[in-house]
Amino acid sequence: MKIFLDTANLEEIKKGVEWGIVDGVTTNPTLISKEGAEFKQRVKEICDLVKGPVSAEVVSLDYEGMVREARELAQISEYVVIKIPMTPDGIKAVKTLSAEGIKTNVTLVFSPAQAILAAKAGATYVSPFVGRMDDLSNDGMRMLGEIVEIYNNYGFETEIIAASIRHPMHVVEAALMGVDIVTMPFAVLEKLFKHPMTDLGIERFMEDWKKYLENLKK
């Protein structure tokens, strides 16, 4: 399973890359606006750091506008993946962009039916929103599992990115389902490291080592 960071913060991305566990990044206009950064410049900076897929979202909602923006964004770096909303015009744009060799990520997916359309259009990635679906019906993980099963049934090449991840159990459950990628906020990534027994074990080891050193001095 690949791990993506859902952020536009360069310091968070640097830490994840230094840990050696981050394979890519997903962004959106909201995340970039929070950083106060110029959009295209920040996308380039992220691509330079990650050397892996970086999803950058279009803001147009019409077919022509999405395709135009996508072509411009794709010029920034070979790592750029274009995030396209799950709409009729969006799916049409995905079909066009896929034919041109431009990688796409269909976002704001909330049902298996939508995920089928994304795969049929040739999307590189599809992003089901687990946490937001949980907010509505507590069925986020079930939706994700159904998408995994459908894609396996038909051998779709579109990779599934579990998005809107709220806590470590989302990550574990997605991994158990065989999801290709999980994208998460930096805070959730940090939580994956933590377990009270790990902290207790380190504390005990350090106490024993301290006693050992004290005994050597006697």
From Swiss-Prot:
Keywords: Cytoplasm, Pentose shunt, Schiff base, Transferase. It catalyses: D-sedoheptulose 7-phosphate + D-glyceraldehyde 3-phosphate = D-erythrose 4-phosphate + beta-D-fructose 6-phosphate. PROSITE patterns: TRANSALDOLASE_1, TRANSALDOLASE_2. GO terms for molecular function: aldehyde-lyase activity; transaldolase activity. One of its GO terms (biological process) is carbohydrate metabolic process. SUPFAM superfamilies: Aldolase. One of its GO terms (cellular component) is cytoplasm. Its EC number is 2.2.1.2. It is found in: Cytoplasm. It holds the Pfam family TAL_FSA. InterPro entries: Aldolase_TIM (IPR013785), TAL/FSA (IPR001585), Transaldolase_3B (IPR022999), Transaldolase_3B/F6P_aldolase (IPR004731), Transaldolase_AS (IPR018225), TSA/FSA_arc/bac (IPR033919). Pathway: Carbohydrate degradation; pentose phosphate pathway; D-glyceraldehyde 3-phosphate and beta-D-fructose 6-phosphate from D-ribose 5-phosphate and D-xylulose 5-phosphate (non-oxidative stage): step 2/3. Belongs to the transaldolase family. Type 3B subfamily. NCBIfam families: fsa_talC_mipB (TIGR00875). This is Transaldolase.
